[in-house]
Amino acid sequence: MFFKQLAVLSFATSALAAHGVRNPGTNSLNFNRIDKRFTFPIPESQGSQTFEATYTISGNETFDGGMKTYGRGVDCSGQAEGGDSDAVFIVKDGGTLKNAIIGADQIEGVHCEGSCTIENVWWEAVCEDALSLKTGDGPFTVIGGGAQNADDKVIQHNGGGTVSISGFTAYNFGKLYRSCGNCDEMYERHVTLESVTAVSGSASLVGINSNYGDTATIKSDTCVTDVDTVCTEYEGTDNNDEEPQEISTGPSNACQYTDPLPSC
């Protein structure tokens, strides 16, 4: 009888593991973890174009990239800070970039100088940052698209105002969104995440500076798998020579979400 019960238990455990179900009392999946089989859903490229200089999208202009891959023909320089001249695109106040793939052959990705819309834009591989919201008080809108293989940040918010991120996919990243923690000029910033898919995040989905009044609102239709922390609060500083200090993690008045978020 004992051996029959043991055999049944062994079969049940194997069945759960085969379907990637968590073992009771553990925090890991048996055998088939989602991040091991996750496929980053980047669209098929419709061609490629290499810019010799940064391409500027003027205010109120919409640049439709036709799902081509755009780059600068250079090697990534890691986390060394680049400048506007290293970006693939600069989007001026009121401009829109849509339907584009940012190739791995670049340093700075996309810069927004003022309010911008980034729609269905994908990053093959993030270098320093994927998207830098450099100036202005927004609103900044990210619709769809995605980024993968970011050692640190995907979206860096240096200006003020509000960022809306919806339907975005982040895979193998450090932080999806970071409100600048030590810019020379600090602002109150707000971010909302809706229908975001985040898999394999080594640091935090969102990082904000609550001492400057920042807030993060993460809707319950956002899913996370193997993301170290959902929301981290920092004490930001306007001294660029200092690093911001972590205050807390988890839901709060500044980090607004229901814990736990669903798995992807």
Curated annotation (Swiss-Prot):
<feature type="signal peptide">
    <location>
        <begin position="1"/>
        <end position="17"/>
    </location>
</feature>
<dbReference type="Pfam" id="PF03211">
    <property type="entry name" value="Pectate_lyase"/>
</dbReference>
<feature type="compositionally biased region" description="Polar residues">
    <location>
        <begin position="246"/>
        <end position="256"/>
    </location>
</feature>
<keyword id="KW-0732">Signal</keyword>
<keyword id="KW-0624">Polysaccharide degradation</keyword>
<dbReference type="GO" id="GO:0030570">
    <property type="term" value="F:pectate lyase activity"/>
</dbReference>
<dbReference type="GO" id="GO:0005576">
    <property type="term" value="C:extracellular region"/>
</dbReference>
<feature type="glycosylation site" description="N-linked (GlcNAc...) asparagine">
    <location>
        <position position="60"/>
    </location>
</feature>
<dbReference type="InterPro" id="IPR004898">
    <property type="entry name" value="Pectate_lyase_PlyH/PlyE-like"/>
</dbReference>
<keyword id="KW-0456">Lyase</keyword>
<keyword id="KW-0325">Glycoprotein</keyword>
<dbReference type="InterPro" id="IPR011050">
    <property type="entry name" value="Pectin_lyase_fold/virulence"/>
</dbReference>
<keyword id="KW-0106">Calcium</keyword>
<feature type="compositionally biased region" description="Acidic residues">
    <location>
        <begin position="235"/>
        <end position="245"/>
    </location>
</feature>
<keyword id="KW-0961">Cell wall biogenesis/degradation</keyword>
<feature type="region of interest" description="Disordered">
    <location>
        <begin position="234"/>
        <end position="264"/>
    </location>
</feature>
<dbReference type="GO" id="GO:0045490">
    <property type="term" value="P:pectin catabolic process"/>
</dbReference>
<comment type="similarity">
    <text>Belongs to the polysaccharide lyase 3 family.</text>
</comment>
<comment type="function">
    <text>Pectinolytic enzyme consist of four classes of enzymes: pectin lyase, polygalacturonase, pectin methylesterase and rhamnogalacturonase. Among pectinolytic enzymes, pectin lyase is the most important in depolymerization of pectin, since it cleaves internal glycosidic bonds of highly methylated pectins. Favors pectate, the anion, over pectin, the methyl ester.</text>
</comment>
<protein>
    <recommendedName>
        <fullName>Probable pectate lyase D</fullName>
        <ecNumber>4.2.2.2</ecNumber>
    </recommendedName>
</protein>
<dbReference type="GO" id="GO:0071555">
    <property type="term" value="P:cell wall organization"/>
</dbReference>
<keyword id="KW-0964">Secreted</keyword>
<dbReference type="InterPro" id="IPR012334">
    <property type="entry name" value="Pectin_lyas_fold"/>
</dbReference>
<keyword id="KW-0119">Carbohydrate metabolism</keyword>
